[in-house]
Amino acid sequence: MNIKISNANQPSWKVINVKSHIPEALKKLDELAHNLWWSWNTEAMQLFASLDGDLWKKVNKNPIDLLRSIDYDRLIELSKDGETIARMDKVYGDFRKYMDVKPDAKRASVAYFCMEYGLNHVLKIYSGGLGILAGDYLKEASDSNVDMVAVGFLYRYGYFTQSLSMDGQQIANYEAQDFDRLPIERVLDKDGYQVIVNVPYPNFMVHAALWVANVGRIKLYLLDTDNEMNSEFDRRITHSLYGGDWENRIKQEYLLGIGGMLALKQLGIKKDIYHCNEGHAALCNVQRLAEYVESGMTFDEALELVRASSLYTVHTPVPAGHDYFDEGLFNKYMNQFPARLGISWDEFMGLGRTNPDDKGEKFCMSTFLCKTCQEVNGVSWLHGRVSQQMFKDIWPGYLPNYTHPNHAERSHDEWFKIYNPHPEESHVGYVTNGVHFPTWCAKEWQAVYAKYLGKDYIYDQSNSKIWEKIYNVPDEVIWNTRVLLKNKLIDYIRARFRENWLRNQGDPSLVVSLLDKINPNALLIGFARRFATYKRAHLLFSDLDRLSKIVNNPDYPVQFLFAGKAHPADGAGQGLIKKIYDISQRPEFMGKILFLDNYDMQLARRLVSGVDIWMNTPTRPLEASGTSGEKALMNGVINLSVLDGWWYEGYREGAGWALTDRRTYENQEHQDKLDASTIYSMLEQEIIPLYYARNRKGYSENWVRTVKNSIACIAPQYTMKRQLDDYYDRFYNPEAARFKTLVAHDNQLAKDIASWKESVAQRWDNIRVVSSERSENLQNGALVSGKEFSVKHVIDEQGLDDAIGVDLVIMSGAEGNEEIYSVMPMNVVGREGNLYTFELTSSVDLAGSYKVAYRMYPKNKNLPNRQDFCYVRWFI
């Protein structure tokens, strides 16, 4: 038998790429789609939706995917449609007018480094608040027309997509991104080939392909190692955000800092200021130091220039947010740099240690940045104070206070004025985070604001006078806008639950029962954030009987929405999600407490505009900022929060609700129970009655008044416009001005400062107090309030020329809780050779028990702050 049942060889496939052919008349659409400006321009998004509404939803509102997927016949039809062409021309005209404005040359230019960017849900290169903040920042930089460039990663898988099993277990799904379907472009060289950045790791080379995301006027350059030039292990460097082990983490941070700087150098880009948004980008300063040294400068001279042009923003006081590397692992990747820098390995390691002499201490990226950046800042008033305390041991001899004044209603400027009563003790500052208004404000609210505040309100977002016009908006407009957005959210939730139930093959009768219990007329409270334990998502469930009475009141119904992801390695966070899910499935809570999976930017926009109350309950003071509440208030949503992060500054009586900023119990479990009871009481006695106090027109006048107060009194202070302006006023422009003086005349001042520091360091141990004289009352420690005392010290400066300063430092408070009462500078009143005479006459106004000591330090008018050269000697 010669005939076989089958006879076939394996196919050999050839990959071909079919690009969508966009008719010439519609070419402008492609340019619009490749600039993320569309993501915060309502008319642009409406334009894309009008091409094919069903397909627009199917491609998850991704214009690149839309243009690739739309039927060619439909494109031909649209190219001949006058209305479509007119709409496209209008949007494109607005876009070109926006793009063609030249950057503001009066402001410093900035290179911005961050591990993640939340620009739009279709570009999955973010995980949470840090990335969203960075994305908003680039958008506002574009809107404000500043000269900025950004560097990050193009992740193949990004952060995980979350789903829940039928029993409430978090499932982390990693879905590969198709880069050709994203609003990004390859960076091409002059020959039309994609630019490859060759990053020299020890003993091997990593080849990073370079992409660009156009964020309005700002270019975000993205490094991508997932290509055939790299080994399997190196391709993984840009696979996942915060994925892998510690070795992959250091490879990522090496690529971001060193590879990012090499990318900018290859593109010919130099900026005035280099801003490290979190510690992940710390190694950019290693590369910058190396380049200065290799240009002929000493390490100390190079450090002056790098420090003077660098800013480090810290985003968390939580230890897990600061990367520490074992010396062995750090040496594996960084051992070539000491020779390039002209220093020893121990000196290099010391830059990342709080105590450089502690050989057992790991290398901390945050510590390294504190030592190589002139300026360091937290992301809210309170977080700035916490950061001063967190980093104080890096600059021994200075005593920043952790205490803070009782909360009071103050303007943003007033908070800044009371920030640091003793600025000589710490240079660590703050800029309170804001949010990008066009991204997070629902189009329905934008229409209200444009009508009643004036169309130009968007260009002057931080002007409180403009926002006061909200009081002129009819109450019915405020209430109806809130109801409209809540109904849209409810419809979205119902669709999500149906889809998820079908995907999990759940009992259809259960989902029908659940959806029937969702009440669009109920007071709706939202809680959505990263599920770390300090966020205290469990707080509401401390007393289930009391909670059941709240949600099951037939006359005043209340519903709660929860959303958020826990890191795949965070078992406790995942346990919280399961606990909430399990409670939500109990009969008394079914449809009253809902957990929505896969919290991303798309869901976040719906939540912050659709709920009535935004709840935030972190363990104080671990919430650095917490911008979701800022997004909510711009949409007429009222905040209920712990006085922490931005809300410590933002809270105003009559414009939201706050838990006290004072801790009652040291035991955290007891404090949690007290805070939970407080929340229940506020809901029962204030919030719920206020919401349901309806007038004859069916709305609560006092609720609307609270919404208006929230918008008028708080919103203008928490825009990204205000945040960007603060960075320029407090950090970028002053640093750039100082840097300009340092590099003038072939870096002469930088060289002079480095030489002066070397001279002081050589003499420091020999500088001595020759004699001291004190008034009798000070000598005996028996001062009387209001009565003067005097002191005189003669100091041998060992040949230095008026380079020493002396403070009298007075401390108050019990042992372990001391605070600075006063820092009194002593004055130089005479000189004989190397001997300088310092005198002080002063008094203490308040009776009490104090400690006093004298502090000697080097002084130089060209230093930006005392921590820049932290030599201190105490004496009594």
Tell me the role of every PLM-derived stretch:
Residues 1-876:
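Catalytic cores of carbohydrate-active enzymes across secretory and cytosolic contexts
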